[in-house]
Amino acid sequence: MSLQHIVLFSFPRPLSEQEAATMRAMIASWPKEIGLMSKCRFGTDLTGERTRGYGYLLYTEFPDTGALREYQKHPVHVQFLNWVMERECTPLAFDYHLDQSTILAPEPDTAARP
């Protein structure tokens, strides 16, 4: 059963432009370097007004819990995790299955679009 893995990242100080670019580049490499995920998104909040100090969000989907576990152990992910922890990041992670009880509005059928 597929699942969604979401992580919010809070750093004790704002990342520099270079650090933010490095973080994004590391995550952007995952679809090619790690694979395993069916979706990978990363961004910042539009206003920062309601984030309670969490400045970045990572959104991924995996086909099953086995793929998530492989991703978590993958050397490229471990390197990223070490990088954020070196910057005293406080991550907040949430994983849940995607099924009839959690998908409240299905994605539109993109194949039907012109």
Predicted features by range, described:
Residues Q72, L81-V84:
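Short, flexible helix/strand-to-coil boundary loops that buttress conserved ligand/catalytic motifs
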Residues M1-Y56, P63-K73, C89, Y96-P114:
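Short S/T/G/P-rich N-terminal loop/turn motif that feeds into the first structured element of a domain
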